[in-house]
């Protein structure tokens, strides 16, 4: 079996080399992204990058809400590896606030080709037609 392509994840306990698993949530087919690492030669779940909030609005199939556990580190990870664009919208559930992100499906396909392809097929799109990150307007680029 081929070793998955990893990304560095920095957090308060150090640096982890993680790989992505792309899938969809069973209840509504929203985008799921999991963070995994190899433990004793086997893939082991490290954390969920996304959380399913079926009541919260999304702007497209490439959008998801970020799990609130270590969310600052997760948002930094997304920016660092250019996996998506952080949106201004948030959603609340219980006492938690979740940030919305528009993911670049082509970029996700670089790290989990099979999972991304299956997710896209489930939604009837091909990789060449994948939604990209929303382009930044001029004032955002100058920051």
Task: Describe the residue ranges of each PLM region.
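Acidic, aromatic-enriched beta-alpha/helix-loop junctions
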Residues: 34-82
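A broad, low-specificity signal marking well-ordered, structured residues that form hydrophobic/aromatic
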Residues: 49, 99, 141
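Short, cationic low-complexity segments
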Residues: 116-133
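Structured catalytic/translocation cores of nucleotide/phosphate-coupled proteins
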Residues: 2-3, 86, 143
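OB-fold ssDNA-binding interfaces and closely related basic DNA-contact patches used
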Residues: 1-40
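Short, compact, well-ordered microdomains
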Residues: 67-121
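Non-Sec secretion/translocation targeting segments of pathogen effectors
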Residues: 133-143
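A generic structural signal for short, solvent-exposed coil/turn residues
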Residues: 1, 25-27, 43, 76-78, ...
């Amino acid at each position: 079996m081929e070793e998955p392509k990893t990304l560095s994840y920095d957090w308060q306990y150090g640096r982890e080399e993680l790989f992505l698993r792309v899938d969809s949530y069973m209840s509504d087919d929203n985008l799921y992204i999991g963070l995994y690492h190899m433990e004793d030669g086997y893939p082991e779940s490290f954390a969920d990058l996304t959380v399913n909030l079926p009541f919260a609005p999304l702007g497209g199939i490439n959008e998801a809400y970020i799990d609130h556990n270590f969310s600052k580190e997760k948002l930094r990870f997304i920016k660092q590896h250019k996996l998506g664009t952080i949106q201004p919208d948030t959603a609340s559930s219980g006492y938690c606030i979740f940030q919305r992100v528009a993911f670049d499906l082509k970029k996700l396909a670089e790290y989990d080709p099979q999972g991304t392809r299956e997710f896209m097929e489930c939604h009837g799109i091909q990789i060449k037609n994948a939604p990209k990150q929303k382009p930044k307007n001029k004032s955002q680029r100058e920051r």
